[in-house]
């Protein structure tokens, strides 16, 4: 799934400096690129999504507006990125929706286990204008603007223990994100959910701090988690939604021209072929 309508704009941010804001408005050209932060690796749908957005912004502005993409948690983990984005220090963030539940509880619509039967059903909701309008209001209330969604298919479990029945989940220490809905799901199965920053997962599996983890296939492969795990259990318990958001504080500094340029952006399907269904 990758049908986006991006109707927000750009303005100078804290990392670019107030001086560059004035220069950009006066000369119509940015002195520094605006940062877009992500915690995902380069070889993922998340990165391609972010780069496509940055490319379209530059193309439609004839090179006057530039965005630099920073993957691999270079600018911070998911929580740090959200906090910095809300403050306007990092204007753009592309990330999974799960960490956002702490900041905007209604984003949990994608964190209810076993709610969707197929990834196509998820995409139907995301592509529904009425649904998107409701979600955009949720982000507005939280201090952000929602520009669009993408997905990486469903999340699955990897483990070193063969799972043949529900009883086999009992006692397994599984890494989860810091999300109460995710943790409640694994507790209900008898597992022991262990919230952990993703950058620590590989070492955690290697050292035995955790027994298992759950992520979409692309994340498992790109981070070589298969080197530490023997089995994949296709639980398909949650869709892995990727959101592109912008700071509301950052948006206040937009010029009319910048808003007009971004209103023209429509990313039709830059990563559909890489999205696993």
Protein language model features and the residues they cover:
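Sec-dependent N-terminal signal peptides of Gram-positive bacterial secreted proteins and lipoproteins
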Residues: 1-16
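N-terminal secretory/targeting leader peptides
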Residues: 14-121, 130, 137-268, 272
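Short beta-strand-centered segments that line the small-molecule binding cleft or hinge
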Residues: 124
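Serine residues within intrinsically disordered or low-complexity segments
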Residues: 275-277
């Amino acid at each position: 799934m990758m049908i986006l309508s991006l109707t927000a704009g750009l303005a100078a941010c804290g990392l670019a400096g107030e001086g560059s804001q004035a220069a950009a408005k006066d000369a119509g050209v940015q002195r520094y690129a605006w940062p877009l932060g992500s915690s995902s690796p380069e070889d993922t749908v998340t990165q391609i999504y972010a780069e496509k957005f940055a490319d379209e912004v530059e193309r439609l502005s004839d090179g006057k507006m530039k965005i630099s993409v920073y993957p691999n948690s270079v600018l911070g983990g998911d929580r740090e990125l959200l906090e910095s984005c809300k403050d306007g220090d990092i204007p753009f963030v592309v990330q999974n929706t799960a960490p956002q539940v702490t900041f905007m509880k209604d984003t949990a619509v994608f964190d209810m286990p076993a709610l969707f039967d197929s990834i196509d059903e998820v995409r139907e909701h995301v592509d529904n204008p009425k649904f998107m309008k409701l979600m955009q209001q949720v982000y507005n209330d939280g201090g952000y603007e929602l520009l669009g969604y993408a997905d990486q298919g469903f999340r699955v479990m990897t483990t070193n223990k063969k799972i043949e029945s529900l009883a086999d989940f009992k006692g397994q220490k599984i890494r989860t994100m810091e999300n109460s809905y995710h943790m409640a799901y694994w507790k209900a199965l008898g597992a022991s959910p262990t919230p952990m920053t993703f950058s620590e997962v590989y070492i955690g599996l290697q050292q035995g701090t955790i027994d298992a983890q759950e992520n979409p296939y692309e994340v498992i492969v790109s981070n070589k988690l298969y080197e530490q795990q023997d089995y994949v259990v296709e639980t398909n318990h949650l869709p892995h939604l990727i959101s592109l958001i912008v700071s509301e504080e950052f948006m206040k500094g937009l010029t009319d021209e910048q808003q007009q340029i971004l209103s023209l952006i429509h990313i039709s399907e830059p990563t559909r072929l890489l999205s696993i269904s």
